């Protein structure tokens, strides 16, 4: 792997589910961590389909620390597992999660990104997902997005 492209760069890794940071990007994160300026990991959903969200989110924190990333660089976007494939991409129609939830959430000790930015949970819809990702990119100003 040609790692020079990561040298002194800010990297943002966005993954859909907890454990994808290690399964999909673990080798890249571990390799780039020694030469990148910073690496931030954003997790889109909570992995709460089976109701084990807090455990899954804490596992993400543990896995990134093993890769050499500080917990402060972990961002939970906090969207519950839902049927996003059948949702309205263009409109603002709200989605209800598989567990009946209508808004974002994360851990009490580490709230989701939207809450940290606004003091409110975000309704689950594509407008809010897009807005959160755009705001995250604007906040971090990454050179590389994975």
Stretches found by the model and what they are:
Residues 1-140:
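Active-site rim/loop-helix segments in enzyme catalytic domains that contact anionic ligands
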Residues 140-146:
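Short N-terminal targeting/anchoring amphipathic segment
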């Amino acid at each position: 792997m040609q790692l020079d492209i990561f040298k002194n760069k800010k990297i943002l890794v966005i993954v859909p589910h907890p454990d994808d940071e290690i399964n999909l990007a673990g080798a890249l994160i571990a390799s780039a961590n020694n030469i990148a300026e910073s690496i931030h990991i954003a997790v889109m959903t909570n992995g709460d389909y089976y109701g084990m969200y807090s455990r899954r989110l804490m596992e993400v924190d543990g896995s990134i620390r093993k890769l050499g990333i500080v917990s402060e660089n972990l961002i939970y976007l906090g969207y519950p597992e839902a049927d996003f494939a059948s949702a309205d991409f263009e409109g603002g129609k709200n989605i209800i999660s598989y567990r009946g939830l209508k808004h974002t959430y994360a851990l009490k000790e580490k709230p989701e990104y939207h809450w940290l930015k606004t003091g409110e949970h975000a309704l689950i819809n594509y407008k809010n997902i897009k807005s959160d990702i755009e705001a995250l990119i604007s906040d971090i100003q990454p050179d590389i997005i994975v």
